[in-house]
Amino acid sequence: MKRILVSILLCLSLASPAVCGPRRAIILRAQFKDVKFEMDEAQAKALADSASAYFTEQLATTVTFDLGPVITLPQDMSYYGHNSTLRRDELIYKAVMETCLASVDAVDFARYDADADGVADNVLLLTAGVSEAEDAGDDAIWPQMNYLNEWSAAFALDGRKIDCFSVSTESAGLRTLCHEYAHSLGLMDLYDTDGSASGGLAPGLWGTLSLMDKGLRTGDGSLPPNFSAVELDVLGEGTCELAAPGLHRLEPMGSSRRYLKIPTDVDGEYFLIECRAARGWDADLGCSGLIIYHVDRSSNPTGYSNYYKKDLTAAERWYYNQVNCRPDAECVHVVAALPTATSAAEIPFPQPGINNLDAETNQAFRYRDGIPVPYVLTNISTKSDGSVSFEISEPLKLLEVDVFQDAAILNWEVAGAIGQDVECEVAWCRDIEKIHTSGKAKGHTYTIEGLTPGANYMAIVSATTKDGHSYSVRTDFTTRTYREGSRPYILIPASQRNADGSFKPWARLPLRVANAPDAVSVRWSDGTNEIKAGDDGHFILTGNCTLRAEITNKDGSRDVIIKEVTIR
C-alpha cells in the first residue's frame, strides 16, 4: 500500500496557503447505484452551515459552504472505491468528474475561485455511505484530498479549471470534512501517517489538540477542534507575538487566536505557546491550560523515511506530509507538563504541583540539538475566564561575545531571581568536533583561548545554583581569519571609535593583537604604566594615552605596536 499513500502525500504538498479575505466552497453530493444517502436535506444543510461557521471562526473571515444537488452516479461504490497496488480509490477521480458535470446546471463553479487565478480552489465531494477509514471495507471511499491532475483528468467548467478536490463521507461527520478541506488550505497531517513504520507510532499531538491530528476521531465527530497555534502559524493567520521576559496573559485560542513564539538560532525551528479551554469548538479537547509546541520546519536532519527510502530534513517532512512519522524525530510535538503523560489531561500547564517550566526539569523544552531553551516559565495559572497567566524570565543572558582570531570573550548576566551566588562554567567545541572543552568562570565573564582562526565554534555558558539547579545559554561564532601578508596590529572594535578615528569616552578595549600567530606573550602599557584587562576581559580608557603592545614571539624576537589614543 506504499504507492497509495505516497500519491496522496505528494498531492498534499502541492496545496496552497489560505487566501486572505472571504471565500466560498462547494459541497457536491454523490450517491451510488448501490449506496444511497441516509442524510436528509436538512442534515446536509446543517453540515454545510456548521462547516461555514467553523472555518469563518478559524480564518477570521467569512467562509461559506454552498450545497450542491444530490447526484446519483451510474456505478456501484466499489467501482470508484476499489484500491489498486498503485493507488487508493483508483477511480475516485471519475466520481468527482461525473458529479461536477452532473451538477453544472445547478452550480456556478466560477464562484469558487477566491484568488481569481482561473482555477477553482477546491471541490468537496460528500459521498453516501460509510468510509473505508471507518472499517467499511477496501472498496468503500477513503476520505482524502487530491488532484485530478494525478490522473491527467483536470478539466474546465464555467471558465474555471477543476483540479483540487476533497472527499468525505456522510458517516464521517463534520470533523473529517473539515480536516480534508483544510488540506486544500495548505495544512499537513500531524499524526503518524505511516503508522508503526519509521521507528514505531509517534504520539503526534495526542489525537486531540489539532484538526490535522487524530482529533477528528474524538467525541462523536461533530466538533472539530479550534486551529492550534501550529495551524495558524503555518497559514500565517492569527496574532503571533515574540516571547519576551515579563508577565504574560493568553486568552483561549477559540476567542483570541493569539499565541507566542520562541525562535531559535536555527531558521525554521521554534516553540509556540498557546492557551486552550475545553469549550466551544474545543469542548471535546479533554484538557485546558497552557500548551507548548516544539515545531521544526528547518533543514535539521530527521532520520530515514521508510516510504521515500532516504533521509529527510524537517522541511522535507513537511513537504512530503511525513511531519510526525518518526517518534524519535517528530517535527511537531507537545512539551507536556507531565513528561510521563499518558492522556491529554496531563498535557497542559499547570498540573498539581507543576506550575513552572524550564529545560532542566523538562527535557522536551530543548532544541533538537539538545541545547536548553534560555527562557523559564513560572507561576503558570488558569483564570476563571479560561485564560492563562505566567511569567517568562531569562535566568542567564549573554551580554556580548567578542570574537578574535584565536580567542573569544564571553560576558553574561545572571538574573536576580536565581540569586547571584552561582557557579558558572563555559564549554565549547568546533563544529567538526564532538568533545567539548570546558573551564570554570570567575564571575560572569570568560575568555576562551587557543582557538583556530577561521573556524566555527559553539559555546555553552552554564550557571548552577547552590541547590543544584542549572541554567544554560548557547552561542555560535566564527573566529576571524588571518590577513595574509599583514603585520600584527592592535584589534580595536569599531563600536568603540568615532567617525573621525578618535575614541569614545570610557571605550572598552579587549587588549588583543591580530595577525600575530607566533606570539607567546603580549605586554600592554599606556605609555607610562603596565595595563591589564578587567574582570570582563576589557580595559577601559579613562583619558588620552599612548597604547603600547610589546609582543614576544616564539623565536625570541619582539614586535612593538604603538597607537595614539585621543578621546572625544
Predicted segment positions?
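Non-catalytic C-terminal accessory/binding modules of secreted extracellular proteins
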Residues: I26-Q31, K36-F65, I71, D135-S171, ...
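Extracellular low-complexity, O-glycosylation-prone stalks/linkers
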Residues: A417-T437
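Solvent-exposed segments in extracellular or luminal domains encompassing
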Residues: I448, G537-C545
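Active-site-proximal segments of metallohydrolase catalytic domains
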Residues: T56-L157
